[in-house]
Regions:
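Short arginine-rich
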Residues: 44, 71-84
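GIY-YIG nuclease catalytic motif and its immediate N-terminal context
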Residues: 1-43, 47-59, 64-71, 88-90, ...
Length: 105
């Protein structure tokens, strides 16, 4: 079966501070998903640890590719994930600018 692209998909990593707790997720709408995480509605895990900083993301055309990458990252050792973040975002800055509130942990 041929792959169909509906829209773009994202694999993303959230945290609450540099080198803090990490959460890896996949979504078809990064803005909506981040707003839900900020409100504590994204997932119980992100709400519990107040994971509101988007520190890494990758964009995919196909959902199957995004899900495969999410699974791959979830199976990585923690240090590999940290290295990936620091390679692309060495200052651990919040990459989501949808709300000024999210710029602080």
């Amino acid at each position: 079966m041929a792959k169909r692209a509906y829209h773009n998909y994202w694999v993303y990593i959230l945290t609450n501070k540099p080198n803090g707790t990490l959460y890896i997720g996949v979504t078809g709408g990064i803005d909506d998903r981040m707003e839900r995480h900020i409100k504590g509605e994204g997932s119980k895990f992100t709400a519990k640890y107040k994971l509101k900083m988007l520190v890494y993301y990758e964009e995919f055309q196909y959902i199957d590719d995004a899900i495969a990458r999410e699974k791959q990252l979830k199976n990585w050792h923690r240090q590999w994930k940290i290295n990936l973040i620091e390679e692309h975002n060495p200052k651990w800055e919040n990459l989501w600018k949808g709300d000024a509130e999210t710029s602080s942990a």
